[in-house]
């Protein structure tokens, strides 16, 4: 999953191809005993054009849960109505947290009816201008920067709890850059946030392309994780490069290098409650909705 500041703006991708969506429900078991969910960033272009219709198609595919990544042209209340009308549930939303007062974002979360308020990217210091400046900001974060990010996460989480919400931190791959002595920014975030207040949404795809194993984190930090992103990438060298020339190439689940069976097996005992498929654009082999169906079928099959 990826970043609110630019990536989360429901960018336009390939036009929707006509696809046949099965309306029958499968009978086999689902991972974690919970029906599959999807991060709506995956179908961001479709949500921009026809949010209500896109949500209905996701429900027809078989998804029960969605995770919001902005509201497109709708208000949070209208967005929630579209989700309800489609027969879907939305337990989590990615919001544009910063050092500013998070109160208005909590109001959005309440209007949407979510339990989890998630930061896609959380940076305490001022960011560079434009995409190039933003990417440079991420790639140049120091250990002290990550300590400030952890302090900001604690502050947001305290305020979220007071507002009746649970804050969660979502990762990319840049947090796993070696800062010296084998320590990473993600290590700092885990160590310096309050386990009772700050929970995590593990983006397993970004962890894996950085050369890390989600299973290791689930076992070392039980009860810190509440959600996961299920995404796949074409196999390549491990990298913490998020947007540069070595950026990993996203693909449909089961077509890349990540085996999610051991990840799901470890996620349940670690306290994970929800899992959301997500795919990084561009969609070159099929439309975003067709990819959403392929991802659903993969997750459903390995349950």
Where are these regions (language model features)?
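Acidic/histidine-rich catalytic cores of soluble enzymes
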Residues: 162-257, 264
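Hydrophobic faces of well-ordered beta-strands that scaffold small-molecule active sites
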Residues: 34-39, 66-68, 90-93, 117-119, ...
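Active-site acidic/histidine proton-transfer and metal-coordination neighborhood
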Residues: 15, 65, 95-200, 289
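C-terminal segment of N-terminal export signals and the immediately downstream linker at the start
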Residues: 24-48, 57
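Acidic-and-aromatic substrate-binding clefts and catalytic sites of carbohydrate-active enzymes
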Residues: 44-48, 67-78, 94-103, 127, ...
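N-terminal secretory signal peptides and thylakoid transit peptides that target proteins
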Residues: 1-18, 22
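Acidic (Asp/Glu)-rich catalytic clusters
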Residues: 30-31, 55-60, 74-90, 103-114, ...
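Conserved, mostly hydrophobic/aromatic
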Residues: 38, 58, 66, 83, ...
């Amino acid at each position: 999953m990826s970043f609110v500041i630019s990536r989360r703006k429901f960018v336009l991708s390939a036009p929707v191809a006509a696809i046949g969506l099965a309306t029958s429900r499968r009978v086999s078991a689902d991972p974690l005993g919970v029906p599959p969910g999807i991060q709506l960033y995956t179908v961001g272009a479709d949500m921009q054009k026809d949010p209500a219709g896109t949500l209905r198609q996701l429900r027809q595919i078989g998804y029960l849960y969605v995770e919001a990544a902005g509201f497109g042209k709708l208000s949070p209340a209208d967005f929630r109505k579209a989700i309800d009308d489609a027969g879907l549930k939305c337990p989590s939303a990615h919001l544009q947290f910063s050092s500013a007062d998070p109160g208005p974002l909590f109001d959005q979360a309440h209007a949407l009816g979510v339990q989890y308020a998630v930061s896609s990217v959380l940076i305490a210091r001022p960011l560079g201008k434009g995409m190039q400046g933003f990417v440079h900001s991420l790639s140049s974060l120091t250990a002290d920067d990550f300590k400030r990010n952890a302090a900001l996460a604690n502050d947001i989480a305290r305020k979220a709890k007071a507002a009746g919400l649970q804050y969660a931190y979502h990762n990319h791959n840049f947090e796993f850059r070696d800062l010296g002595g084998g320590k990473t920014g993600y290590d700092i975030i885990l160590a310096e946030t309050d386990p009772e207040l700050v929970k995590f949404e593990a983006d397993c795809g970004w962890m894996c392309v950085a050369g890390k194993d989600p299973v290791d984190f689930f076992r070392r930090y039980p009860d810190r994780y509440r959600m996961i992103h299920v995404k796949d990438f074409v196999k390549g060298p491990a990298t913490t490069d998020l947007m540069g020339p070595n950026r990993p190439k996203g693909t449909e689940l089961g077509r890349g290098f990540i085996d999610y069976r051991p990840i799901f097996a470890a996620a349940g005992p670690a306290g994970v409650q929800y899992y959301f498929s997500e795919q990084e654009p561009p969609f070159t082999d099929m439309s975003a909705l067709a990819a959403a169906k392929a991802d659903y079928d993969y997750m459903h099959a390995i349950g």
